[in-house]
């Protein structure tokens, strides 16, 4: 990988790397090569040094103070290794990971960061946060986005334009940019200072594809951060394990983030780093592994997550689709001012329900907005949907009236959304908890009457066949166990459920 990158730079026609009729010994003696190489590395966006670590508070808003796992970040070893952060949704894992990565950059253990996420929507949302981080940590940095539709991402194209634009003095006008050379190929995504990508871009480094060694070289020199590490299937976890083994072999570092990680998956990830944990693990926790037994840091009592109850009900319906009564309840909730999310497992079901809701609202001669968000849109339309979803249901949304969104799994993870009531089709317990992380996510003084506490309605099938749902999730046993727990409780109590429920469902 290193040799390929050197060859690409050395053979580029944009620079004249030698003076005609100059002896090779004189060429090196005059330091011409060193100067030219430095210019090329800067021009191509490969060279930038992070500023000294200034503390996690620099990454937080001025009114915020470190909380939860964040207070333990500065106690993590600044040595190459695997760090695993387990903490509830919305508890600041991302800032904790970025702060720890900054500490490793400051110690010279790495010179860049790669942030991998499960979906294009979450990668797009992370790009803006990466820009803010880059300004604080690098000052002048190249931020690269990599997924199959990045050419349609307006924010990334703006970074590319900033990289191409020059002032009259030949300096970049923007401190955050993406050099054209880096943007020309997704193979170079990990060669800038910060790479934001979907996780498949990382996994390609261990698959038999062209120039995989270039991706590997970029990863090995970076701090690799993988978000929502619980969200991948067995095949992807196998590939991720190989990525971690190679990262360890070259003395690299990795940070894994999850709110809902089964013990078996945690053990496999630690084993990939030739390390091990304990079965009866605390929660939340930060693990650091080099080799042998991983060290585990718990969160001080005063910073532990507050007890949080989500009121639940489980309804058995034909094909788990809302009937007339449930549709009426959804509309009534929105009329009372609630922001309601309905999460379907199939795009066709989401479209069908949205049509049904709009038809019923029209018949009642009332005005309620019904939004739809899924992965089947043209990408340019999907971007608009992402922005609208965050605008209407995010932290800074104006909540002057009720609203309904019918969505699929695209709102399940990493998006900063806040709902008063959620209805969701049956899904594995860890993914259910991710969905519940969008309920009452932010502190608000006033919630609509009847929704002062977070509420979730799980829609399940009438029989135990689960139909297409078992094909989506591939494990009927997990769905059945999840439903069994829901049927026996009228509420889920966090953070204890992150361990208790998940281990009961995923018991060996």
Feature locations, PLM:
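Conserved interdomain linker/interface between the two RecA-like ATPase lobes of SF2 helicase motors
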Residues: 276-350
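Conserved Walker A/P-loop ATP-binding site and its immediately adjacent core
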Residues: 111-134, 145-151, 261-265, 347
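A substrate-engagement module of RecA-like helicase motors
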Residues: 130-193, 199-203
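Walker A/P-loop
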Residues: 79-101, 232-233, 258
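C-terminal helicase lobe and adjacent C-terminal extensions/tails of nucleic-acid helicase motors
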Residues: 266, 318-398, 419, 423-508
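Post-DEXD/H (motif II) to motif III coupling segment of the RecA-like Helicase ATP-binding lobe
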Residues: 217-223, 230-299
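N-terminal accessory nucleic-acid engagement/regulatory domains that precede
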Residues: 1-58
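Conserved pre-motif I regulatory segment
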Residues: 51-86
């Amino acid at each position: 990988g290193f040799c390929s990158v050197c060859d690409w730079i050395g053979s580029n026609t944009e620079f004249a790397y030698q003076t005609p009729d100059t002896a090779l010994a004189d060429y090196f003696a005059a330091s011409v090569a060193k100067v030219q190489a430095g210019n090329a590395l800067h021009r191509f966006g490969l060279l930038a040094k992070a500023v000294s670590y200034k503390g996690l508070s620099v990454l937080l808003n001025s009114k915020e103070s470190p909380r939860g796992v964040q207070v333990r970040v500065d106690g993590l070893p600044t040595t190459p290794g695997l760090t695993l952060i387990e903490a509830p949704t919305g508890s600041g894992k991302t800032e904790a990971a970025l702060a720890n990565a900054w500490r490793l950059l400051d110690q010279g253990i790495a010179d860049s960061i790669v942030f991998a996420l499960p979906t294009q929507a979450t990668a797009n949302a992370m790009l803006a946060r990466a820009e803010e981080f880059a300004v604080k940590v690098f000052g002048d940095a190249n931020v690269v986005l990599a997924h199959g539709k990045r050419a349609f991402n307006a924010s990334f194209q703006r970074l590319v334009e900033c990289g191409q634009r020059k002032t009259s003095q030949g300096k970049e006008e923007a401190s955050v940019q993406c050099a054209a050379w880096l943007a020309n190929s997704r193979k170079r995504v990990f060669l800038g200072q910060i790479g934001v990508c979907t996780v498949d871009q990382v996994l390609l480094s261990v698959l038999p594809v062209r120039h995989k060694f270039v991706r590997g070289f970029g990863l090995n020199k970076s701090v690799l951060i993988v978000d929502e590490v619980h969200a991948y299937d067995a095949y992807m976890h196998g590939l991720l394990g190989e990525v971690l083994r190679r990262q360890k072999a070259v003395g690299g570092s990795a940070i894994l983030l999850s709110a809902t990680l089964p013990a078996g998956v945690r053990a496999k990830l630690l084993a990939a780093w030739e390390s091990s944990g304990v079965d009866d693990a605390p929660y939340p926790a930060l693990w650091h592994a080099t080799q042998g037994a991983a060290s585990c840091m718990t969160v001080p009592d005063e910073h532990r997550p507050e007890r949080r109850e989500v009121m639940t009900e489980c309804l058995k319906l034909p094909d788990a689709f809302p009937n007339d009564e449930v549709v009426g309840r959804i509309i009534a909730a929105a009329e009372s001012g609630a922001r309601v999310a309905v999460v379907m497992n199939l795009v066709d079901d989401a479209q069908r329900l949205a049509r049904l809701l709009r038809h019923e609202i029209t018949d009642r001669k009332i005005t309620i907005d019904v939004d739809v968000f899924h992965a089947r849109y043209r990408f340019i339309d999907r971007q608009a949907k992402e922005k609208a979803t965050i605008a209407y249901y995010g932290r800074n949304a104006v909540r002057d009236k009720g609203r309904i969104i019918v969505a699929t799994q695209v709102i399940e993870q990493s998006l900063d959304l806040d709902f008063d009531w959620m209805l969701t089709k049956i899904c594995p317990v860890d993914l259910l908890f991710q969905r519940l992380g969008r309920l009452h996510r932010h502190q608000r003084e006033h919630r609509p009457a009847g929704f002062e506490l977070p509420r979730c309605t799980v829609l399940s099938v009438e029989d135990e066949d689960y139909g297409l749902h078992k094909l989506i999730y591939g494990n009927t046993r997990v769905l059945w166990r999840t439903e069994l727990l829901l049927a026996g409780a009228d509420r889920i109590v966090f953070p204890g459920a992150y361990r208790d429920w998940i281990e009961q469902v995923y018991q060996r």
